[in-house]
Amino acid sequence: MARRATGQSGGPGRGAVKGARRPELRLPPLEPFRDGELEPDGDYDSLEFREEDLTGHDGGGARFMDCALKGCVLDETRLHHARILDSALTGPRGVGTDLAEATLRDVELLDARLGGVQLHGSVLERVVIRGGKIDYLNMRKARLRDVVFESCVLVEPDFGGARLERVEFVDCVVKGVDLTEATLADVDLRGASELEIARGVDRLAGAVISSGQLLDLAPVLAAQLGVRVEG
C-alpha cells in the first residue's frame, strides 16, 4: 500500500518548477494468482502475478489493488477502464496492450518492454516509469499528474491533447514526441538525455528545458515561427 508520496523540487539551481510526488509502495504479503484467466470487472487484491502469460485476456474494468506483476506477457491484453492502484509492474512485455481510459495511481512500472500501448484517455497519478523501452506509447487526451519517466527510452510517444502536470523526465531518451494540443504545467524536461519533438513544439509553455536543449530545438522552433536561418 502506498502510504506517502515524496516530492522533489529539483534542488538548488533547478528553478521554480514543482517536482513530481513519487509513490512509496509498501505491498502487503501477497498470494499467488491461480485463477488462470483475467475476468472483466474482476477484483484482484494483494496478489502476485509471476510470469503469467496474459496474452489476449480480457480484464476490462478490473481493479488491481496492492498487486505485483512480475515478468508477465501482455500481448493484446485488454485492460480498458481498469484501475491499477498501489501496485508494481516489473518486467512486463508485450505489444498492443489496451489500457485506454484506465486509472494508474501510486504505481511503479519497471523495466517494461512494450510496444503500441494504448493509454489514451487514461489517468496517471503518482506513477514512476523506470527503465526499459516503450515504443509508440499512445497517451492522447490522458491526464498525468506527479509522473516520473526515469532511465527509460520512449520512441514516438503521443501526448496529443493530454494534460501533464508535475511530470519529470530523468536520464531518459525521448524520440519523436508528439505534443499537439497538449497542456503542460511544471513539466521538467531538463533531465532528458535526448529530446526530439516531432510535433507540438508550440505547446512547450509550462515546461522547463536546459540551454543545451534549447540549442538542439532551435531548428524546430525556427520552423514553427516561420524564421529562415541562413549563414
Q: Model-predicted segments: where are they?
A:
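Short glycine-rich, low-complexity segments
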Residues: 8-14
